[in-house]
Amino acid sequence: KYRGIPPYEVLSTKWLPYSDVIRLKGVEDMVEVYYNSGQFPATMKLLEKKFARPSEIFTSLAEYYEKNGLTGISHSRLARYEILYRFLEEKEVKVEQSTPAAEEPAGMEQKTGAKAAETAVKLTLADFRDSLMYDLYVRENIKSRPSFASDQSPYKKEVREFFMAEEESPQWLTDYAGFDSKQMAKMAHLEHMEDGTFVLFDYKNRDPLSGNARAVRFRYDQKGSRMVPAKPARI
């Protein structure tokens, strides 16, 4: 069976009932939104570690959208991030509730499926908050922050000092000549992550293929006196 009016779509086949076609369409939509769009690269990498198979990511997301009445709605970019975070919150709660208190008997170390993925890499909601904020800012210097964003006010001093240092002696923002530190802080963005690092998003320098801003990660040196380049803990 198929729709007789545009858009022409298959509704069911000899082998697939209508319910399965709808389910596959939901999975297709999730792949398009969260993978093919290229707007969630860091978060997708983490999700691949959390789930046993990539297909489970999109199947679970499609089920979450359907269960919460989110399908068939034109969501904003920011809303897609909010939805993904709520999905992750729910998954986190389910994992915590299903974690057995006792250790598994000897000889039972080999695990398969989703449980293996959950125990292989201990990912927390903080890891995903960091990856989602990275994905948001690497695309654009957003003005409206999502509800799950961490409070940046405790790090105002560090951010201010970073841009003042760049104004005085540019090291990372060499294409911002003629702009003072306050202007630089508006044109670029420095985000404190929950893993203790800072990420600088440089919107004057973008990847020609993805359009993503150049991102440089920093942490304070052992003396705590200056920021030095750092590798991320998860992303």
Where does each model-flagged region fall?
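Generic preference for hydrophobic/aromatic residues in regular secondary structure cores
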Residues: V10, R129-M133, V199-F201, F218
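Charge-dense, extended regions
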Residues: D151-I235
